[in-house]
Design a protein with these regions (language model features):
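Hydrophobic structural segments characteristic of membrane proteins
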Residues: 96-196
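Short, conserved beta-strand/loop elements in beta-sheet-dominated catalytic cores
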Residues: 6, 82-104
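A hydrophobic, helix-centered structural microdomain
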Residues: 7-8, 12-60, 97, 164, ...
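Short, glycine-rich, amphipathic interfacial segments at transmembrane boundaries or analogous
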Residues: 37-76, 134-153
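Alpha-helical membrane and juxtamembrane elements of multi-pass inner-membrane transport
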Residues: 74-81, 162, 166
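Short, well-ordered beta-strand elements within core beta-sheets of diverse protein domains
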Residues: 80-87, 156-160
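Soluble non-cytosolic domains of exported or imported proteins
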Residues: 16, 74, 86-90, 162
């Protein structure tokens, strides 16, 4: 049994390296700073954890500021970063958050530690009691285009329907959404759409 576990880990590491190494090399060669980006987020029962992503923004980007609150987010996003965000490849390092137990594959996306409006609205429906996910119902039903109240309602739908079958549905729809680049709006939580 231990040898089986070891071989599975070896296969996992090799598969990840095939994806990670080219991305790491491109980020390192095209912009200053670390390849990875860590940020304090809200986990299950509102416990803090550090989420891991590929860095997609310049090192002078204001710290701990949600992208939608930046005056002009495009000026901070690197060219490589724009591609990674559009394809959701920047989220790949969160596989390690899943291995650690901080996150699930499916669940509400983890809020920044200082997103008080999102956190408080989620409190009303018990959403903060769930383990956050790599993808979730809100991600495949609007993502960046959703204002926070609508995003919370989508999270509530997931909270009320948690099941293996619903998770499989979310996973399938995520794959479709990623290929179509649905809902990717830099700086958007519905605000940009409303202004237009």
């Amino acid at each position: 049994m231990p040898s089986l576990v070891g071989s599975e880990m070896c296969i996992r590491d090799r598969c990840l390296s095939v994806l990670y190494l080219p991305i790491c090399a491109i980020i390192k060669c095209t912009s200053e700073g670390s390849v990875f980006f860590r940020q304090k987020r809200i986990g299950k029962n509102k416990k803090y954890f550090n989420i891991l992503k590929f860095r997609t923004m310049r090192i002078d980007t204001p710290k701990d500021c949600p992208t939608h609150l930046l005056k002009n987010p495009e000026q901070y996003i690197t060219k490589v970063g724009a591609f990674l965000r559009k394809t959701s490849l920047d989220e790949l390092p969160q596989i390690f958050n899943i291995f650690k137990g901080d996150m699930s594959v499916i669940g509400p996306r983890p809020a920044l530690w200082n997103q008080d409006d999102l956190i408080s609205e989620r409190d009303e429906y018990g959403i903060n009691d769930l383990k956050p996910g790599l993808t979730g119902w809100a991600q495949i039903n609007g993502r960046d285009e959703l204002p926070i109240p609508e995003k919370v309602q989508m999270d509530k739908v997931y909270c009320d329907n948690v099941s293996f079958v619903f998770d499989v549905k979310c996973l399938f729809m995520t794959v479709v959404s990623v290929f179509k680049h649905d809902g990717v709006v830099e700086g958007g939580t519905g605000a940009i759409a409303d202004e237009e």
